[in-house]
Amino acid sequence: MNISPTPRRYNSRNGGIDFNDENYLAFSDPVNRDANGNGIGRERIVPEEYKLNSRMINRLIRQNKELMNKLDGKQEEIDRLNVLVGSLRGKLIKYTELNKKLEDRQNVSRSSSGGSNGMETDSNYIQLPKRRNNKDLDKDTDPRLSKDDRISVLSEKLDMLTKIMMESRNSSLASPPPQQQQTANIPTPASAPTAATSSTSPLPPNTSTSVWQRPSEEDIMCRESMELKQLEDQIESLKRKLLIKRENELRKISLSQELLELMGKLSMEQAQVQQGAAGSTATTVPPRTSTAVPSAEQHVSSSSPEFCMECHHTKTHPLHQHHDHNHILRNDLNSRRPTVPAINPLETPTPFAKRASLAASTGDLTDTINRVW
């Protein structure tokens, strides 16, 4: 009778394992468990030191994370404190400035109160002369006049005052007063330096105010306008001097350039004249040398006897008389020599005629040699 075998799923490799034990981990491999069912098969292989190290490392990692979180919190707190410190510093600066201003005001108020309690003197006030013409005062204080009209009136007054001041100054410079003339005509040892200083220094303008009174605003404005005009005149004179100086410098430069050009032309003309004189002397010298050389050659030819170039005998020698030669005498050879030029003495002279060419021109060379010997 055929019976089906028992399936393997009901049989385990470790027969004594209880899968319903609560001490075992879920989904654990039965191979990792020992035969008694304790479930620590692989853990026995790992030593205890490694386990302790891993636990310490995990603990240190957790502590590191906690410390990093604490550091982040501290950094945020520091940033908030920095912002607070900056705002407090700005407020401190602001309040210190306000405190200084208040102290200055208090000092000014104290000084003003102390001055009012003291004695009042004339030097504490500006003294102005009284106006004599009420019409001008009425015109100035007239509310119907506009601002432009007031400005025009003031400008007219200033022009009139400047004209009067300039006229008075010119008149004082042109004609000194009679008292000064008399003192200048009769100088004394005590009054001589005073007269010299008074004649050199201009007289002050005659003002209607007394010595102890202070100058008015109009006088001050007139004095300032006069000083400005004097400064303008000085500036214009300095400008004219500068222009004249620049023109003189430019003229000097142009004249120096013309002088250099003329000197260059003169030197070139002198060089040309010297070259022409040297060329004329060079052309006149060669005829003298050409005439002198033939005279020397004639003297040599007259003093030296005539020899035959083939037999080397004179014409009167008996051996020479037996031969019929086309004689080329030494004097003829000397006459054929080229003269040394005087202008260019280092030129290459033409070579003399060779003996072979001379023999070929006179006849057969072998025949002449046989005849000689």
Swiss-Prot record:
The annotated regions of Low complexity compositional bias extend over 187-210
Q: Where in the cell is it found?
A: Nucleus; Cytoplasm, Cytoskeleton, Microtubule organizing center, Spindle pole body
Pfam families per UniProt: Spc42p
> Where is coiled-coil annotated?
54-89, 222-275
A single GO CC term for this protein reads: nucleus
- Database matches in Gene3D superfamilies: Geminin coiled-coil domain
Keywords of the record: Coiled coil, Cytoplasm, Cytoskeleton, Nucleus
Q: Where is the composition biased (Basic and acidic residues)?
A: 134-151
Superkingdom assignment: Eukaryota
Q: What InterPro entries does the database record attribute to this sequence?
A: Spc42
Primary localisation category:
nucleus
> Where do the record's region annotations for Disordered lie?
104-151, 169-216, 278-299
- Keyword Nucleus in annotation: yes
The similarity comment for this entry is:
Belongs to the SPC42 family.
Its job: Forms a polymeric layer at the periphery of the spindle pole body (SPB) central plaque which has an essential function during SPB duplication and may facilitate attachment of the SPB to the nuclear membrane.
Q: Please give the name of this protein.
A: Spindle pole body component SPC42
Q: What species was this sequence derived from?
A: Zygosaccharomyces rouxii (strain ATCC 2623 / CBS 732 / NBRC 1130 / NCYC 568 / NRRL Y-229)
Q: Gene of origin?
A: SPC42
